[in-house]
Amino acid sequence: MSHALDAAALDQLFRTARTQNGFLDKPVPASLLQELYDLVKWGPTAANTTPARFVFVTSKEAKAKLAPALSEGNHDKTMAAPVTVIIGFDLDFHEKLPYLFPHTDAKAWFDGPQEGRHEAAIRNGSLQGAYLILAARALGLDAGPMSGFDAAKVDEAFFAGTSIKSNFLVNLGYGDSAGLFPRLPRLSFDEAARIA
């Protein structure tokens, strides 16, 4: 079923991909954002919980709602990015499990207070956010993930009255290499991993 991707594909996804701090003044069409989600949705999550919820912030009005929640260091680049994705997670994700995981009563595993679902929601929602970054790169987009923002303000502006909470943000577009910092090091296998 599977075969290894070639070196060029691995470079595009990982080795030469960079976290972008600046983007070209080139719009990202809504059809490409839909194509992006249609890739992301196939990424695995525990019991197919798929708790992530995505808001693609593209309009000036929506950016203005987001702006007060951004840290100073993330403000200008986010306002200039063609798209900012709010990666959220739905604490009531289990309500969809009769459809998403029909061969057993998985909904019952998560019935009870929302706090009991938080760990599964944020863990699997974070997975889906990572899939979004890789899917964006696979489609020729560049990404700049960020955690410097006030989650309570984002939740009030975009998720008020819902069971959805914000997790992190990702700027998307076509990267401007002029805004890149020098490539930073990564930990070696021996520093970060072991075989047990």
Curated annotation (Swiss-Prot):
It is an enzyme of class 1 (oxidoreductase). Transmembrane segments: none annotated. The keyword Flavoprotein applies. Its cofactor is FMN. GO terms for molecular function: oxidoreductase activity. InterPro entries: Nitroreductase, Nitroreductase-like, Nitroreductase_HadB/RutE, RutE-like. Its EC number is 1.-.-.-. Pfam families: Nitroreductase (PF00881). Keywords: Flavoprotein, FMN, NAD, NADP, Oxidoreductase. It comes from the Bacteria. HAMAP family: Oxidoreductase_RutE_HadB. Belongs to the nitroreductase family. HadB/RutE subfamily. This is Putative NADH dehydrogenase/NAD(P)H nitroreductase Smal_0358. It comes from Stenotrophomonas maltophilia (strain R551-3).
